[in-house]
């Protein structure tokens, strides 16, 4: 009787563990990643003293937000000549981060000051300032809303009028 019980138990364990089927499964072939190629179409001059944190191309100019303690600016860069023109200077205590353009305004994040600045594109004057929790990193738009990253796994969708 004991022999029968032990054979029965062994058989049940074999079936429960998949028996020969578990060994019959073959691992899937590794997926080969798709390889992309690229070609550099042109190279443009750029000041090596500008620590780029945000870029956007619009109306023939490259808009650049730079980050540097005490020296963060938003500037335009003419890609043909390499000439830059300062559009706005951030307060000394702010480290500039991501920028984006929307509806005649330029939005800029700060890294750890918890502030976003909004400038009028025609005059360069600051027209609004918003506060937000956490750090500011990247900023973009879909033409209606703003999308902000803060260095975490989250992307935040924001109303440009309220920054909420």
Model-derived segments and spans:
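A short beta-strand motif characteristic of beta-propeller blades
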Residues: 40-45, 83-89, 125-130, 164
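Beta-propeller domains
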Residues: 64-88
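Beta-rich, blade/repeat-based domains predominating
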Residues: 48-59, 92-103, 132-149
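Short loop/turn segments that connect beta-strands within beta-propeller blades
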Residues: 78-82, 120-124, 160-163
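Conserved beta-strand positions in repeat-built beta-propeller and related beta-rich domains
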Residues: 64-68, 106-113, 148-152
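A short helix->beta-strand "capping" segment at the edge of beta-propeller domains
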Residues: 29-48, 79-83
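Structural signal for beta-propeller blades
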Residues: 71-74, 115-116, 154-156
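C-terminal motif of bacterial Sec signal peptides marking the signal peptidase cleavage site
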Residues: 15-16
């Amino acid at each position: 009787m004991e022999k029968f019980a032990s054979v029965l138990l062994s058989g049940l364990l074999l079936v429960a563990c998949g028996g020969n089927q578990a060994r019959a499964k073959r691992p899937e072939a590794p997926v080969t990643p798709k390889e992309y190629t690229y070609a550099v179409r042109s190279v443009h001059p750029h000041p090596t003293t500008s620590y780029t944190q945000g870029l956007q191309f619009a109306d023939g100019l490259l808009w650049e937000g730079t980050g540097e303690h005490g020296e963060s600016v938003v500037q335009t860069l003419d890609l043909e000549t390499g000439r830059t023109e300062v559009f706005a200077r951030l307060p000394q205590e702010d480290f500039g981060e991501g920028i984006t353009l929307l509806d005649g305004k330029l939005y800029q994040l700060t890294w750890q000051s918890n502030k976003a600045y909004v400038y009028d594109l025609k005059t360069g004057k600051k027209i609004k300032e918003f506060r937000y929790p956490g750090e500011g990193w990247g900023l973009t738009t879909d033409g209606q809303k703003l999308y902000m990253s803060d260095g975490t796994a989250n992307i935040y969708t924001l109303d440009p009028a309220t920054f909420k």
